[in-house]
A protein has these predicted regions:
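Terminal alpha-helical segments
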Residues: 1-327
């Protein structure tokens, strides 16, 4: 099944191509990121759209490196979590299912965060000190008191009327951090689906995924994590083998099948829910790795982030670098 086709090509053209015109290195990640450019007031203009919502104008050379910095920070977290998750399970086949699912979830969560940055959007949390700085910067430009929301989201788009200019739509989030991420990821999936050819295998697969997200909720990975981690009966379910480690639910070359075979009217038990979680998040993981490979290819060289990570590790992490096309 061809999972990455015309819809995927749209994402590559719309987002990865402009991102590939810029580069950030490992040493610059602490200051080339979205929070820093907002704290330092590096926008050229700002407009208050509504309460706590702002349209900020940036030069391309400022905002794209900051966005890449955010993306690599999320990617590093995903890589560390993936490495720990993948190496733990083979060593401990009786690894607690509850903790396996939770550990796998955080790997998926940071992959999802990486995908958002690759598609020029993201979730952002401002602690009180950061919030105060940004409020002051915006208020100074606008001439009266303004404030950003503690939990916010942003979308960055090219201004097609002015060369080298990007606009950030910074607005309050209606959800907490994890919920926000999964709702935003569903929007990315919707964009890929909308640009897929009507009768393509990619569209069929994404139609099935859309049904899963509609029935179980966009936020179902986080709901699963919360249930197995906090609800006491899931300890008994683990002992009685009614839930399994996330890694045990992988279906080799047919890993997308739980999504393709999903029936909206049938009851979805815990085991099926974990299978769907694994299939969905593996799709996101492959999508992210593909897009990063596309970025490196378009940019003309690898980022150097992976080698910088391994420079500080006694046991190197293995990074996927080949793009993936078929299920």
């Amino acid at each position: 099944m061809l999972l990455f086709d015309k819809g995927y090509a749209h994402i590559k053209q719309e987002y990865i191509t402009p991102l590939s015109q810029q580069h950030v290195n490992y040493r610059s990640l602490n200051y080339k990121n979205i929070k820093t450019v907002l704290c330092e007031g590096k926008f050229t203009s700002v407009e208050c759209v509504s309460k706590n919502r702002y349209s900020l104008t940036f030069d391309e050379d400022i905002i794209i490196p900051a966005l890449l910095g955010d993306m690599w920070l999320c990617y590093i977290r995903a890589c560390l979590q993936r490495d720990a998750t993948q190496k733990t399970y083979p060593l401990y086949p009786n690894f607690c299912p509850n903790w396996s699912i939770v550990s796998d979830y955080y790997y998926a969560f940071y992959s999802a965060c990486t995908l958002l940055r690759l598609t020029m959007r993201g979730n952002i949390y401002f602690d009180s000190a950061v919030q105060k700085k940004i409020n002051m910067n915006i208020s100074t430009v606008l001439g009266d008191a303004h404030a950003v929301s503690e939990n916010s989201t942003y979308v960055i788009q090219k201004d097609h009327t002015r060369s080298g200019i990007y606009i950030m739509d910074l607005k309050p989030s209606n959800h907490q951090t994890h919920e926000t991420v999964w709702h935003e990821v569903a929007a990315v999936i919707g964009e890929i689906r909308a640009n897929a050819s009507a009768r393509s295998e990619e569209r069929v697969a994404l139609d099935c995924l859309d049904t899963v997200l509609h029935v179980l909720d966009n936020n179902f990975p986080s709901k699963l994590r919360n249930a197995v981690n906090y609800q006491l009966p899931y300890g008994i379910k683990a002992i009685e083998r009614k839930i399994y480690p996330a890694q045990a639910c992988q279906l080799c070359n047919k890993w997308f099948d739980p999504i393709l075979s999903f029936e909206a009217k049938k009851k979805c038990d815990d085991f099926k829910r974990v299978q769907l979680f694994k299939a969905y998040t593996k799709y996101l993981d492959i999508l992210v790795n593909n897009l990063i490979a596309e970025y490196n290819d378009l940019h003309g060289r690898k980022s150097g982030i992976e080698s910088a990570i391994n420079k500080h590790r006694s046991i190197p992490i293995e990074f996927p670098d080949a793009t993936y096309t078929y299920q």
